[in-house]
Amino acid sequence: MLDKGEYSFSTCWNIKKHTIGRDMIEEIKELGFRQVELNYNVTEEMMKTIEPMIEKGEIGVSSVHNVFPFIDDKDYDTDSVMLGFDDEVKRKRSVELLIRSMEYANRYGAKAVVVHPGEVPFEYNIDLDLKKLYRDHGKDSPEYQKLWKDMSERRERLSPLYTKRIQDSLEEVSEHAAKQGWSVAIGIETRSRSYQMPTLMEAKTICENLKGGPVYLWYDIGHAMMMDRMGLYDNLKELQEVKRYIYGVHIHETLELSDHWCSYVHSKDLQYFDHFLEAIDFAKVKVYELKAVCQPDEIDESHKLITSKIAAMKG
C-alpha cells in the first residue's frame, strides 16, 4: 500500500471489529499510515496493547478524540450538551474530561484533541426528523421548511448563550493546559446535526475571542457539506472566512446526507471536492475519518486523487 506520509487515519474505521488494540492499529498500518487518530470509542483496555506501540515508535498519534479514553456515560457521549451544560456540575465534569483527553494527547505526543463542544439542546433529536423529511420530500418542501424554521428559530435564539458558555469552558481548559505547559491544540469540530455546535461562524466567534490560546477550528469536511445541504450555513463561502482558524481536518465526503465516504471515489464526482483541497493542505493535522465499508483500494485511490490534485494546485 502507498505510504500515506503526513496523513493520519481514525480508528473509527475498524474499531467495531477489534477487541485487541494492537490488531486494530496493525490493520491501519497495513493501509500505509504511520499515524492514527484515537477516537472516543478506544478503551483503556485497548490502550494496554497500543501504548507499547507508541512508546516503541511503531505508530504515531496525530490526535485523540474527546472523550478519550472511552467512558460509558450518555451525558458525555459524542452527542451531548458537553461544555455548554446548564447544570454546573455537569459542565465542570465536561471540562475535567477534556483536560483528561489533553493529558493523554500530551503523553502520546499528539498535536491535538478533537472535541464536540456542545449543542443547542432540544427535547428530542429534531435533526432525525429533519433528515427524514429532507429524504422523503426534499429541502424545498413545505414539510421540511416548516420544521427547519422551528428548529432554526430556537437555535438562533439560544446560540449566543451556549456559544458563550462553551467559550468559557474552553478558556478554563486552556488556562489549565498553559499551566501544565502542554503544546496540544483543541480543535472544535463542525458537526453532523443541525442543532449541534459550532457552525462555522460560531467557531469563528469562539476562536477570535480566545485568540492566543490553543483553541482552533477542526474542519470536518463531510459534516460541513451536510450542514450546507440542509441549509445551516453556506459552507464554501464561509470556509474562506474561517480557513485561517483551521488546525485539523477530518477528510471524508458526504453523499446526500450520508457521511464518511472516500472522497471522489464514492461520489464519482471528480470536481466538487476540489473546493476543500486548500483547507486540507493548510491544516496542520490531516485525518481520514472513514466508515467501515470503505475498502483499502478505495482508500488508496481517494488518497492518490487528493494528494495529486494538491500537488497540481501548488504547481
Question: Which residues fall in each region the model found?
Answer:
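Short, charged helix-to-loop "capping" segments that act as catalytic/coupling loops
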Residues: D72-Y76, K179-W182, S192-Q196, D228-L232
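Histidine-acidic metal/acid-base catalytic patches
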Residues: M1-T11, T19-E27, E44, E55-G57, ...
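N-terminal pre-domain/capping segments
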Residues: M1-S101, N106, H137, P142, ...
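Active-site acidic/histidine proton-transfer and metal-coordination neighborhood
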Residues: L83-Y216
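Short amphipathic alpha-helical segments, especially helix-boundary/capping motifs
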Residues: M1-L2, M24-I28, D75-D79, K146-M151, ...
